[in-house]
Amino acid sequence: LVPLLGNLLSGLL
């Protein structure tokens, strides 16, 4: 779940 959240945040940024 951690890596997935990181990817989502990177997508927004």
Curated annotation (Swiss-Prot):
Main location: secreted
Localization, UniProt: Secreted
Annotated Gene Ontology cellular component terms: extracellular region
Keyword Secreted among record annotations: yes
Modified residues (Leucine amide): L13
Lineage: superkingdom: Eukaryota
Function text: Antimicrobial peptide.
Protein name: Temporin-1Tp
Protein's organism: Rana temporaria (European common frog)
